[in-house]
Curated annotation (Swiss-Prot):
SMART domains: RRM
Single GO term (MF): RNA binding
Protein function: Component of intercellular bridges during meiosis. Intercellular bridges are evolutionarily conserved structures that connect differentiating germ cells. Not required for fertility.
InterPro entries tied to this protein: Nucleotide-bd_a/b_plait_sf, RBD_domain_sf, RRM_dom, TTC3/DZIP3/RBM44-like_helical
Basic and acidic residues biased stretches: 56-76
UniProt entry tagged with the keyword Repeat: no
Ranges of compositional bias, category Polar residues: 78-94
Mutant lacking the gene: phenotype: No visible phenotype. Null male mice produce an increased number of sperm and show enhanced fertility.
Protein name (Swiss-Prot/TrEMBL): RNA-binding protein 44
Region of interest (Disordered), ranges: 1-25, 56-94, 905-925
Quaternary structure, from the entry: Homodimer. Interacts with TEX14.
Tissue expression as described in the entry: Highly expressed in testis. Also expressed in other tissues at lower level.
């Protein structure tokens, strides 16, 4: 058993209480410090069996029989006496003043040590100083206290030092509060572990002024306690451990012994330099503790915390030639058991305050909620090197890595070493207590007179439950060590988890939040700590959260795959948007340009504006939905889960409304194409059944405009009111035709044949005419209504392509033109002009007919004068779209006889006269013109006598079915339809020309005959 201790005295100067932070100023002289440390003691056990007595037991880990001897060349009176049988050893050494001021810095768990270069005095020791000043003028007394193996109590410090510590005791709390605090902090360790380890006591003491006594084992009123141990990697861990846990034991006996032994030598050690002696002794400790030959069992120490007292335990922990003044405050009821891989996390968490240089202090919460702690030392390297290995801590093992150590301040030749530490916490399952194995000298609190303390079971249970809940979170934490940088990447991001359960802020324990009742810590120390914390956290914030970010971020491969998928979906969405956009433009183009199939005359101005507005509305809605889908795809929503991008429904609704309205508005439009046939030839176009089907589906308005020149001659023939060929069946579905069809129960004109239309002629109707003759009452009605709105129309044909609406308006300006519409076809161009007064229209026809417009003469004719004709008794074709006004011409002039308006009628009359003798003879002039038309192959050779079955009147069919169902209620609908089919077959395949009553009778007869069979 070997132990070394250093006594620090300073009778002239006072050390400032700055919350554990030393200031290298006038109030602090680092050269006047005495350290109390252990050289051969590897572990300490705080044992309080049966509550009888508080004791601090230490077990010697080093098993070397040879003890390191400090070189006497630089230490005049330094000597190490090691004796396992003796209880005390004294060494006195004299060292010279160092060249550079001894500053220290605690930078992210890394101690920077200043020392001057010199030769290594002893190859068996690890010297942290490379050189010492040759002049040694200070004397330091080193005391080795080798305590008995059975245990020596250290609990009577307050009574022995009462006389000399009067001033100090006034600033602290009273004895009662200290005893209560001490009794709550300590607990008996298990008897099993107490038997396996030897006990020794390593205390830190400091005399600040001439009137001070030794305060051993824990809380020093002047906050100048010193903590030190053999294994160098464990010193830093021990510092934090002592700060957080404040191991409270009774130190009266040890205090008495130390006081009796050291009081005679107090005055001698006033002005002695402690740094050199300390580091010489520390080298020996480092060598023994890290020697490969020492493989002793690590002792365990039971640590409990319950209540923080008003006095702050300030321990001066030194590493190398740096002395760290630490305030150790305890958190109530924090006795817990840690897994072995939790201690480093807890220890590193508290020391996240990194100072770049100068005096600094360890954080007060070095080990938050500490329980069982085991400190392992680093193995000694084979040969001395200024580079001391650092520790890379994993879950259950420490890995030695090379690292360089440097000092922050000092001479340029100084070599620095930074020795990292490793803390491995192991949980000791004990129902009564939590035991921590500590391989270093533990700082124990002074000013405590209690003999023993018992930690309540509730405190232990509560803390255990808290730690068990956090075990899963800390299980996988791995840490790496970099030179002069942070120990743990996840250190700062785990602050909240490692905070005490009672901490309202959730962060590690600090002096600010652990103030005992009635007392407060030094405000300067708190402010200084805050400054250091802020500076270091800003500097290392990126590294602190690096581990957490790496765990949360998926692999690079997954990221690339996701990006490619999103990119592909965005491309597909863009394609859909472009297709919909083009589709809208295509529909717009069809409506604007492809008017021949719809037989409509699109007004250039108003129609285009309305259609353009509808198109813009559809495109705007399309773009809005496209942007919404694009944003969702960017958020990671699969495209297949989103609604498709389509504009069909909205597009159709917008354009269908527009088209239907446009068709009604254009009912007044003109078909002046036939007026230009005087010196022109019509194209030879046959009647197409597909066109008939299209016309039947379009439900034409009777007043719809005449198509352009290229329209089928069928429509031209149908414009004759005397040539009814039954096309009214195409518009029987129209609501406007109900009044016409309700007048008769006949199916079509049942008293006549379908192709044998009634040609009841009058002298007026058969007279030669210039224009078309609308015979349908609906046509007349709509024409009159339209005439009231738009006035009277004239047809201007033969326009050249260069004629514009402005040209026509300028030529017809004096006639007060209300509206102008220009229509184009493949080979013909014409215009329709509306006038408010009939007189203006007639005057325009007379004056402007034959006038040249842009170099080409035009033909002008009046097309509508309502009320100048009477309708025939029968309805004419529903496809007749002419609104032309009848101009009676009694002159049988050849030119008049050859008018285009009589060509279809004459041709129809000729065909009918050849087939049926019922027709009266026609005028010779008309026949001549018809023969000319026939020879020119202008009209088809066959009459229009075929009507497809699907064009039958659905309303008449409904009536027939209703009557047959009433007459034959027991017969199904299918049989009734079969009967109608038989009637149609028997009537040469047509029901046209038969009345509804006749059809019903014939179908009923067939059904009765079928029933009889």
């Amino acid at each position: 058993m070997q132990a070394t201790a250093a006594l620090e005295t300073d009778s002239d100067k006072n050390y400032p209480k700055n919350g554990g932070h030393f200031q290298n100023d006038k109030l602090y002289n680092p050269k006047k410090e005495n350290m109390f440390f252990s050289n051969g003691c590897n572990g300490v056990i705080l044992a309080f069996p049966d509550g009888k007595e508080d004791s601090l037991a230490t077990e010697e880990r080093a098993s070397d029989k040879e003890n390191s001897i400090v070189d006497q060349r630089d230490l005049s009176e330094l000597s190490f006496s090691e004796n396992q049988d003796s209880n005390r050893g004294n060494i006195f050494s004299q060292s010279s003043e160092f060249e550079d001021s001894n500053d220290y810095a605690f930078l992210n768990e890394t101690y920077s040590i200043h020392y001057s270069e010199s030769k290594l005095k002893d190859e068996n020791l690890l010297h942290l100083y490379s050189g010492l000043h040759p002049e040694v003028h200070k004397r330091v007394e080193m005391i080795f206290d080798t305590l008995d193996n059975n245990s020596i109590g250290l609990g009577r410090s307050a009574e022995a030092s009462g006389a000399d510590c009067g001033d100090v005791q006034k600033s602290d709390v009273d004895e009662d509060s200290q005893q209560e605090y001490h009794s709550a902090e300590l607990e008996c360790i298990s008897a099993h572990l107490a038997k396996t380890v030897s006990r020794s006591s390593l205390d830190v003491s400091e005399l600040k002024t001439s009137s001070y006594d030794f305060k051993c084992g824990g809380n020093f009123e002047d906050n100048h306690g010193k903590l030190e141990s053999g294994p160098s990697p464990s010193l830093e861990s021990l510092n934090g451990f002592a700060q957080e846990c404040s191991l409270q034991v009774s130190t009266s006996q040890s205090s008495d012994m130390l006081q009796e032994y050291h009081e005679p030598k107090y005055e001698k050690c006033k002005e002695q330099e402690v740094d050199l002696t300390y580091h010489k002794a520390f080298d020996g400790i480092l060598q023994r503790s890290s020697s490969p030959l020492n493989h002793q069992k690590v002792p365990e120490t039971q640590v409990y915390t319950k209540e923080v007292k008003s006095q702050t335990t300030e321990s001066k922990d030194f590493y190398g030639n740096r002395i760290f003044q630490n305030k150790a405050l305890q958190r109530p009821e924090n006795a817990t058991m840690f897994p072995q891989d939790r201690a480093l996390e807890t220890h590193l968490k508290a020391n996240d305050a990194h100072q770049p240089s100068g005096p600094c202090a360890l954080d007060d919460s070095v080990i938050s909620l500490c329980g069982s702690s085991q400190y392992k030392s680093l193995p000694e390297p084979g040969f001395f090197s200024p580079v001391i290995p650092r520790v890379a801590v994993t879950d259950y093992q420490a890995e030695v890595e090379g690292s360089c150590l440097h000092h922050v301040q000092g001479s340029a030749t100084n070599k620095a070493c930074s020795l990292m530490k490793e803390v491995c916490l192991t949980s000791v399952p004990d129902a009564a207590a939590c035991i921590a194995a500590v391989q270093q000298t533990l700082h124990v609190s002074s000013r405590v007179n209690a003999s023993s303390s018992i930690v309540s079971a509730s405190s232990i249970t509560e803390t255990k439950m808290v730690r068990q809940s956090q075990a899963e979170e800390w299980q996988s934490d791995k840490r790496s060590v970099a030179c002069n940088t942070a120990w743990s990447c996840g250190q700062q991001c785990r602050d909240a988890q490692r905070a005490a359960p009672g901490s309202d802020s959730g962060r590690p324990l600090s002096t600010g939040c652990l103030k005992p009742s009635g007392n407060s810590l030094n405000e300067n120390s708190l402010e200084l700590r805050k400054v250091f914390d802020t500076t270091d956290r800003q500097k290392h914030c990126n590294r602190a959260f690096q581990l957490c970010e790496e765990k949360a971020v998926p692999s690079r491969c997954c990221q690339k795959t996701t990006e490619r998928a999103i990119k592909a979906e965005m491309h597909l969405l863009d394609v859909c948007y472009q297709m919909c956009h083009r589709h809208c433009h295509h529909i717009y183009k069809l409506v604007m340009e492809s008017r021949a199939g719809l037989n409509r005359n699109l007004q250039t101005d108003s129609a285009k504006k309305e259609l353009g507005a509808a198109l813009l509305s559809v495109l705007e809605d399309l773009k809005l939905r496209y942007m919404n889908l694009k944003g969702k795809v960017h958020k990671g929503i699969p495209l297949e889960e989103l609604p498709p991008l389509s504009v069909e429904s909205k597009l159709l609704s917008a354009f269908s409304d527009f088209v239907s309205r446009l068709m009604k508005d254009e009912a007044c439009s003109l078909s002046g194409a036939n007026s230009e046939l005087d010196n022109q030839s019509l194209p030879d176009v046959d009647v197409s059944p597909g066109l008939l089907k299209t016309l039947s589906q379009m439900s034409f308005i009777p007043d719809s405009s005449q198509p352009e020149q290229g329209k089928s001659p069928m429509s031209d023939v149908c414009k004759n009111g005397d040539t009814d060929i039954g096309f009214n069946c195409l518009k029987l579905n129209d609501k406007e035709c109900k009044t016409v069809q309700e007048a008769s129960e006949d199916w079509f004109d049942a008293t006549e044949r379908l192709i044998g239309a009634d040609f009841s002629e009058t002298q007026d109707s058969t007279a030669e005419c210039e224009e078309w003759q609308p015979r349908n009452p609906l046509e007349l009605k709509n024409s009159e209504l339209h005439g009231k709105g738009q006035g009277f129309l004239i047809h201007v044909g033969g326009l050249c392509p260069s004629v514009s609406e402005a040209d026509l308006r300028s030529h017809f300006q004096k006639y007060q033109v209300s509206e102008i519409s220009i229509y184009d076809s493949t080979n013909y161009r014409y215009a329709s002009l509306a006038f408010a007064k009939n007189s203006n229209a007639k005057m325009a026809v007379k004056e402007m007919n034959g006038v040249k417009i842009n170099g080409k003469s035009v033909t002008v004719r009046l097309v509508k004068i309502p009320g100048e004709y009477t309708p025939p008794p029968l309805s004419t074709t529903g496809n007749s779209t002419s609104m032309n006004h009848l101009e009676k011409n009694t002159n049988k002039d050849a030119t008049s006889a050859s008018s285009i308006c009589r060509l279809p009628r004459a041709k129809s009359r000729q065909l009918e006269s050849e087939q049926d003798s019922e027709f009266p003879p026609l005028d010779q002039g008309v026949k001549k013109n018809c023969n000319q038309m026939k020879s020119g192959q202008l009209l088809p050779e066959t009459p229009f006598q075929f009507i497809p079955p699907n064009t039958l009147n659905l309303r008449s069919f409904t009536k027939i079915m209703k009557r047959l169902a009433e007459l034959h209620p027991d017969i199904s609908r299918d049989h009734i339809i079969e009967a109608l089919q038989e009637v149609r077959i028997n009537h040469k395949g047509f029901l046209n020309g038969l009345s509804i009553n006749t059809i019903v009778k014939m179908a009923s007869s067939f059904l009765r005959n079928s029933a009889l069979k």
